[in-house]
């Protein structure tokens, strides 16, 4: 995948969510939840402060994160794969 996010943005591949209920019933359509976990594929250089310094991001390629799929999230298809372009502010936690 040849993509480089700018500034405080990251490229995330959504991880699959378990599609069975606790009772073993396979969930489909709207009953199946979209995962809010993903793997970081690429990271921008960092946030640019008011005085022009660049602050590196707190995440790195390979991290598994929990994200908020809000207003600023951009869905794209890159090399046939759906990825999300998020700002670091949309990331809520690093898992593990």
Swiss-Prot record:
GO terms for biological process: chaperone cofactor-dependent protein refolding. It holds the Pfam family Cpn10. One of its GO terms (molecular function) is ATP binding. It is found in: Cytoplasm. It comes from the Bacteria. GO terms for cellular component: cytoplasm. Keywords: Chaperone, Cytoplasm. Heptamer of 7 subunits arranged in a ring. Interacts with the chaperonin GroEL. Together with the chaperonin GroEL, plays an essential role in assisting protein folding. The GroEL-GroES system forms a nano-cage that allows encapsulation of the non-native substrate proteins and provides a physical environment optimized to promote and accelerate protein folding. GroES binds to the apical surface of the GroEL ring, thereby capping the opening of the GroEL channel. This is Co-chaperonin GroES. It comes from Shewanella frigidimarina (strain NCIMB 400).
């Amino acid at each position: 995948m040849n993509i480089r996010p700018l500034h405080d943005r990251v490229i995330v591949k959504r991880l699959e969510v378990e599609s069975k209920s606790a009772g073993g019933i396979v969930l489909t359509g709207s009953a199946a939840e979209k995962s809010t976990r993903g793997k970081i594929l690429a990271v921008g250089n960092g946030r640019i402060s008011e005085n022009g310094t660049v602050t590196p991001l707190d995440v790195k390629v390979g991290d598994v994160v929990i994200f908020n799929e809000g207003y600023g999230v951009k869905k794209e298809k890159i090399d046939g794969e759906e990825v999300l372009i998020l700002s670091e502010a949309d990331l809520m936690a690093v898992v593990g």
